[in-house]
Amino acid sequence: KNTDDGAKIYTPLTLKLYDWWVLGVSNRLAWGCPTKEHLLPHFLEHLGNNHLDIGVGTGFYLTHVPESSLISLMDLNEASLNAASTRAGESKIKHKINHDVFEPYPAALHGQFDSISMFYLLHCLPGNISTKSCVIRNAAQALTDDGTLYGATILGDGVVHNSFGQKLMRIYNQKGIFSNTKDSEEGLTHILSEHFENVKTKVQGTVVMFSASGKK
């Protein structure tokens, strides 16, 4: 497996285009889950005071957090970390962590965060949904006992993609940007339930928004 394949797409140039293409065009027209109507409210609903954002993109969501928030960023891509940090405002950023989510987190991060977000991370990770269980486990270790893991991911199974979505799914999976053709809501619920007592999912278009708390 190579986590790098999903991260390579994010160069300084593509990050500038990301908001327009992914958060604007694709979310609305390909995936049927408009950012400002669905994903941004989901992000803010579960945000805790001490927050870790994993797979940070351009930092779009972080521009909407309260000034008092303490934010840490985790990504495999330095360009993403720097872009998100600059955009969110360096004063809000507590840590920038360059880390592969398949690997256990440093002990110093265990039990630290009130909330952890994974927005559009899981569908970019290599392998099927069951192989991504360790990603959930590693994140759970970094939460406080009453912390919440939440996010959103694009599904490939159990949803009906429109022609635009089908085309993007085919291209992105062929290029290794996505690895989600067999990802389902049921499969996601299963890997979340392995590590959390309380799991909620909601499908909007071809995107599933999830939250999980009560870590086991």
Place the predicted regions along the sequence by residue.
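Short amphipathic alpha-helix with an adjacent loop that forms part of the alpha/beta core around
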Residues: 105-111
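Class I SAM-dependent methyltransferase SAM/SAH-binding core
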Residues: 50-105
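Conserved class I S-adenosyl-L-methionine
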Residues: 1-47, 60
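Core SAM-dependent methyltransferase catalytic element
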Residues: 195-216
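A short, conserved alpha-helix within the catalytic core of class I
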Residues: 125-138
